[in-house]
């Protein structure tokens, strides 16, 4: 039997420069599923994304998804893409196993937790204050470097890593420290700054966009305090859930988030082509 991809629409060109196309997955000409491919809106035309891959229930467990995924890689190679990315829901075990078997590498996970019960209280001696205008520039530069290096360590070329970082800052901090949907805080312990927090406050969720403990202050529980601060600020804003992204291999952060009740919602993987 032959598994192929059959286009069901012309190649689409979005106003943002993203190309996309939907395909039927066919076995000997018989439709058994569907797939949608696109270029990446942030990394540009050299990076592709699986938007969707679906195989009909009766045709699963026969290798259709594997062949369709490999055929999709050939399609985007023809578009000039050099990397492909996919996001998999936490409970889609079959899809995660398939991606891993095909050589996709886990870059990061999205974690989240519901906000229930009493608002967290910071430990004695710890207080929070807004990031000042004078502190904003150095904080932004340090965060830019940190995030870009995380991306580079996870397979993103340098130019793309910095471009994505800058795009995120422009989108989420359009007015700098005064951006309406951002809360930028400094954590102090006994009057000394020990860390910073960038919390996004959006209609549907709160999101920890950056959290950093000063290197010389690590190992003293300030990271946990910063996360409690994030929960307290989110609850104060009326949010019912809080999320974050953690890069694969950041074991201390993973352990901290797990101990605080965060659970995986999705996995983000990539593969060089």
Show the residue positions of the predicted features.
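Conserved acetyl-CoA pyrophosphate-binding loop and the N-cap/start of the following alpha-helix
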Residues: 59, 63-71, 217, 221-229
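Conserved GNAT acetyl-CoA-binding A-motif
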Residues: 76-89, 234-245
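Conserved beta-strand in the GNAT
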Residues: 24, 30-39, 47-49, 54, ...
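C-terminal "cap" of GNAT-fold acetyltransferases
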Residues: 23, 28, 105, 109-138, ...
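A short, internal acetyl-CoA/4′-phosphopantetheine-binding micro-motif in the GNAT/acyltransferase core
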Residues: 50-62, 88-90, 211-218
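A short beta-loop-alpha structural element at the N-terminal edge
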Residues: 4-13, 127-154
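Conserved active-site alpha-helix within GNAT-family acetyltransferase domains
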Residues: 66, 90-108, 224, 248-266
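Active-site rim helix/loop that mediates acceptor-substrate recognition in acyltransferases
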Residues: 2-31, 36, 158-184, 188
């Amino acid at each position: 039997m032959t598994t192929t991809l059959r286009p069901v629409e012309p190649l689409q060109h979005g106003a943002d420069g993203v190309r996309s196309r939907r395909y039927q997955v066919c076995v000997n000409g018989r439709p058994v599923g569907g797939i949608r491919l696109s270029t990446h809106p942030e990394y540009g035309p050299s990076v592709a994304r699986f938007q969707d891959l679906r195989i009909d229930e009766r045709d699963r467990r026969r290798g259709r998804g594997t062949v369709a995924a490999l055929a999709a890689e050939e399609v985007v190679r023809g578009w000039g893409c050099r990397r492909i990315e996919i996001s998999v829901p936490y409970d889609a075990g079959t899809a995660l196993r398939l991606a891993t078997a095909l050589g996709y590498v886990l870059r990061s996970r999205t974690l989240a937790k519901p906000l229930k019960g009493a608002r967290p209280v910071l430990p004695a001696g710890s207080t929070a204050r807004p990031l000042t205008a004078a502190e904003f520039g150095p904080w932004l530069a340090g965060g830019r470097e940190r995030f870009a290096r995380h991306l580079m360590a996870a397979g993103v070329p340098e130019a793309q890593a910095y471009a994505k970082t800058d795009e995120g800052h422009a989108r989420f901090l359009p007015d700098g420290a005064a951006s309406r949907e951002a809360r930028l805080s400094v954590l102090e312990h006994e009057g000394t700054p020990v860390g910073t927090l960038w919390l996004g406050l959006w209609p549907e969720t709160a999101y920890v966009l950056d959290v950093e403990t000063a290197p010389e202050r690590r190992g003293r529980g300030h990271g946990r305090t910063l996360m409690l601060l994030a929960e307290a600020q989110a609850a104060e804003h009326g949010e019912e859930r809080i999320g974050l992204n953690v890069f694969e291999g950041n074991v201390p952060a993973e352990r901290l988030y797990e101990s605080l009740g965060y659970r995986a919602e999705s996995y983000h993987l990539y593969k060089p082509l």
